[in-house]
Regions:
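Conserved ABC nucleotide-binding domain
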Residues: 67-68, 134-152
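Conserved catalytic motifs of ABC-family nucleotide-binding domains
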Residues: 168
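Catalytic Walker B motif of ABC-type/P-loop ATPase nucleotide-binding domains
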Residues: 172-176
Length: 254
């Protein structure tokens, strides 16, 4: 077991966004977390990634209690997260954005960088090689020197994924990676996520596009009004009465 959440609760004033949710993420799997809008999915990701602290409950990663850790400490442990809204430097080139992602792994420090030490030179060579390799992996090798502002939405999403990979994560949290994308770009992102998983990286995914979820996920957790209402393989979830009610009931009441 890679990640474990136990009886997680998150309150915002009088609103209970996550209500006694427990879940496991197994090493090497693709776990999808689904549910209607407002179900608590992104808040749960924020608890895992350290952006929010749980009101109560426990989070363990690789057997260590990481409850209450800040986001930067969580990232150093090997958990990376992507967001639906990309946070890229539009006025920089693709290669520069990726280089900034890899720069966080440099070990030369301030004085080493200032004095161009041997460690700085080694870090620079490593970073340049890694950037070139990553550009090929995410399919943007022909966009290396293009400015981010000229990329399509799908290409920007792939670049964001490349930056998340630059931290050498054990687990990636994908928060609606295909939100707002056309089908062609959705298919491209689906293939990329599968390729990432095949390298041994564990995936936890929030997504509304059910065809994609059913195609990718080995297990699915379903949230509704902050509570976990179902968990199982895609076939079981597709036929679960509570899941059907959560989706169809919301539509009828809309």
């Amino acid at each position: 077991m890679l990640l474990k959440g136990e009886n997680l609760v998150k309150n915002f004033g009088g609103t209970v966004a996550v209500n006694n949710v427990s879940f496991d993420v197994m090493n090497g799997e693709i776990l999808a977390i689904i549910g209607p809008n407002g179900a608590g999915k992104s808040v749960l990701f924020s608890l895992i990634s350290g952006l929010f602290q749980p009101t109560s409950g426990k989070i363990s990663f690789e057997g260590e209690n990481i409850t209450g850790f800040k986001a930067n400490a969580i990232a150093r442990k090997g958990i990376s997260r992507t967001f639906q809204l990309t946070a890229l430097f539009d006025q920089l080139r693709v290669v520069d954005n990726l280089a900034l992602g890899f720069q966080r792994r440099a070990t030369s420090g301030f004085w080493g960088t200032l004095l161009h030490s041997s460690q700085w030179k080694a870090d620079k060579a490593m970073m340049e090689a890694k950037v070139i390799e990553m550009l090929g992996f995410i399919g943007l090798e022909n966009k290396t020197f293009d400015f981010v502002s000229t990329l399509s939405q799908g290409e920007q999403r792939r670049l964001s994924i490349g930056i998340a990979l630059a931290s050498d994560p054990v687990l990636i949290l994908f928060d609606e990676p295909t939100g707002g994308l056309i089908q062609e770009d959705t298919d491209e992102i689906t293939r990329l996520i599968r390729k990432i998983n095949q390298t041994g990286i564990t995936i936890c995914l929030i997504e509304h596009k059910m065809r994609m979820v059913m195609d990718l996920a080995s297990r699915i957790v379903v949230l509704n009004y902050g509570r976990k209402i179902a968990e199982g393989n895609p076939a079981d979830i597709a036929n679960d009465p509570q899941v059907i009610e959560a989706y169809l009931g919301r539509k009828r009441n809309a």
